[in-house]
Amino acid sequence: MPEVYGPRQTILVTCREELEFMGKTKEVHNIITVAWHMPVSHDPLLYAISIGKTRASLEIIKKSKGFVVNFIPFELKEAALICGKLSGRHHDKFKETGLTMEESNHIDCPKIKEAIGYLECHVIEEVDAGDHVIFIGEVTYQQLKEDKDRLFHCSGDKFKTT
């Protein structure tokens, strides 16, 4: 059944941090599919994302204080599904999806080469919101590379485009 507040534009959020797994520290690059996000201020330019408390990306963003909002075209629908279903604790989502990792311009965080645009964000506030945490990030760099049909999530595995 469609949700009252959908469809919502789907983004891929990337993040990076050193985390401890099974007694070993390793650098983790992760991608999470997010449909709950929005601009929250023009001056300064702020953007908010909502991450579930059980997600691996939550710990990464809390520690690193940075994330990249990757706006994706409709043709990356399968990558969005993979990144929404697999856990970053057990999978390298860049390898699983075939997406290309690039370094960001102003923060220590990867971005996705195939994205049509980016917002590089430094976390300035965390808000506890039930079973999610809302991260408010100050946008340190933004770029729109091309204007393509974007991906919108309806419900389940169903998507639309513009």
Short names for language-model regions:
Residues 1-162:
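Basic, polyanion-binding surface patches
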